[in-house]
Amino acid sequence: MKKQIISLGALAVASSLFTWDNKADAIVTKDYSKESRVNEKSKKGATVSDYYYWKIIDSLEAQFTGAIDLLENYKYGDPIYKEAKDRLMTRVLGEDQYLLKKKIDEYELYKKWYKSSNKNTNMLTFHKYNLYNLTMNEYNDIFNSLKDAVYQFNKEVKEIEHKNVDLKQFDKDGEDKATKEVYDLVSEIDTLVVTYYADKDYGEHAKELRAKLDLILGDTDNPHKITNERIKKEMIDDLNSIIDDFFMETKQNRPNSITKYDPTKHNFKEKSENKPNFDKLVEETKKAVKEADESWKNKTVKKYEETVTKSPVVKEEKKVEEPQLPKVGNQQEVKTTAGKAEETTQPVAQPLVKIPQETIYGETVKGPEYPTMENKTLQGEIVQGPDFLTMEQNRPSLSDNYTQPTTPNPILEGLEGSSSKLEIKPQGTESTLKGIQGESSDIEVKPQATETTEASQYGPRPQFNKTPKYVKYRDAGTGIREYNDGTFGYEARPRFNKPSETNAYNVTTNQDGTVSYGARPTQNKPSETNAYNVTTHANGQVSYGARPTQNKPSKTNAYNVTTHANGQVSYGARPTQKKPSKTNAYNVTTHANGQVSYGARPTYKKPSETNAYNVTTHANGQVSYGARPTQKKPSETNAYNVTTHADGTATYGPRVTK
């Protein structure tokens, strides 16, 4: 039985209809279905057989996943790659929407068939239904389309890197050298964090510094790689920027040099004997900061000015005991009262680009009428999952923006004859999309409550030297975010509803698409032949025997080859076909049982013959060698009375007496 297809591409709006039921309305900003490269003639070919069905699906899934991995690659986060990435994204979305539309059309036919057949079983929901009528030609077109898109993307990347020397990829030694240079600066930040982490005045600033550092470097398990000169320079600028911010916010001076934190010397939690070294490091750092002058302010990455800002007042206080990961989309309000406003003067970086405050427009498209999703919500209600923190598609450069733009409530105007109002209300950790089939509805998107810190006297975080970036739209079904610069961010990939599967090499593909590796096979296992006569040998190689005969009796054919009931084959002597033994002209005898024996080579009844070189070929084929001819030289007797005659023979006379 074929399994279910969830969205193969799992991207943007296309994937939402694979995973949401008929009550969900999707916000569509662009129709990508025309971007598909599937030929019209391919739709009328033969469908994929049951035997190859999931091999085909796995192959397509691998194609989509490979393309998405390229789009998410950290080194392609620079804006110079945007056009190439957009072209690849467009192709992926086009093929994904083609599969979506095909499934929608097929499901409509299935509903009509179900209603007319009076089945006693429950009708399958849309996300449980299988896309059966996929032709082999359609698969080939989609596969080749994605393959070509990836090829063109890699080709454009090479051209871009050829024109921009600072984007040329480092070799192994170059990458190691650049990484060391960056992490030397990281060690200085670690020193500041451990020095002021428990400080009553600067502890919160130290924790914030650590959160910014984690954002620049990436996940601990998958840190950003420093693969070219531009990434190295931007990362160093970002690190220097957050160090400058720390000293500016704490109203201290940055020393010219800071002792680098070394875990092998200063980590006293792992080794208690390192406690004196740690205390010495803290003392040296505080002393260096105290003795530093203000000359460092002339060397900062960005310019700081005195400005009057409104102090953000957080609704709810919550002390942070441990370093927290930076939150995306923290909701803060500027509290103003009649006749009073809390104002303070703080040094902040001035924004270089004005944050857009206009209304965001989109298209509200009514979702198709499908049955409700199982194991999700009650009829007519879909619950959005928690807003997980994710690594975005582009590098989260700290030079982008630290400010949280206060955007007005966007109004999404529909194109279906009625408008849908988007009302933003604060609530818990989930948002609910409500709608009634057959009716247009108002959508209430209630943002999640986020963690807050203690109320601070500091104003908004300073902007850096790049265009501010904020979330323009977030798809509720997939968690995919679209930013104001046209880029996308992704959350965890959707499950494909497949059970975990472990192959012959002990590699397990889990339900969420991740892969885990077990111990490698010991290779010391004996050869094993399964019911299909396929033998797996001890070295992992596979050999194929004859296909089993499915309980048929043993059968021997005209060539004395016997196929047994278990599918094995044995070979008997070649049949003699009742012919007598036969000896050919070369004295080779083929006997009645098929064996062959070789006699002496025939002499052809020729007499012995001696050639000019005194080599004699006898009648039985043997050869004997005489003395080499003397070439008509006269007989010659040497001092020992041995005579060599003209024909090469030698005669011996009596020995010479002295």
Curated annotation (Swiss-Prot):
Where is the stretch described as 6 X 27 AA tandem repeats of A-R-P-[RT]-[FQY]-[NK]-K-P-S-[EK]-T-N-A-Y-N-V-T-T-[NH]-[QA]-[DN]-G-[TQ]-[VA]-[ST]-Y-G? 492-653
Q: Where is the composition biased (Polar residues)?
A: 391-406, 428-440, 499-514, 521-531, 636-646
Give the InterPro entries listed for this entry: Staphylcoagulase_N_1 (IPR043072), Staphylcoagulase_N_2 (IPR043071), Staphylcoagulase_rpt (IPR001443), Staphylocoagulase_N (IPR014874)
Q: Name one Pfam family in it.
A: Coagulase
Which residue ranges does UniProt annotate as crossing the membrane? none
State the Gene Ontology terms under molecular function.
peptidase activator activity
Q: Where is the signal peptide?
A: 1-26
Does the record's keyword annotation contain Transferase? no
What residue spans carry the region label Disordered?
391-531, 619-658
Please report the residue spans annotated as repeat (sequence). Answer: 492-518, 519-545, 546-572, 573-599, 600-626, 627-653
Superkingdom per UniProt: Bacteria
The UniProt similarity line reads: Belongs to the staphylocoagulase family.
Q: What is known of its domains?
A: The C-terminal tandem repeats are not required for the procoagulant activity.
Q: What is this protein called?
A: Staphylocoagulase
**Record organism:** Staphylococcus aureus
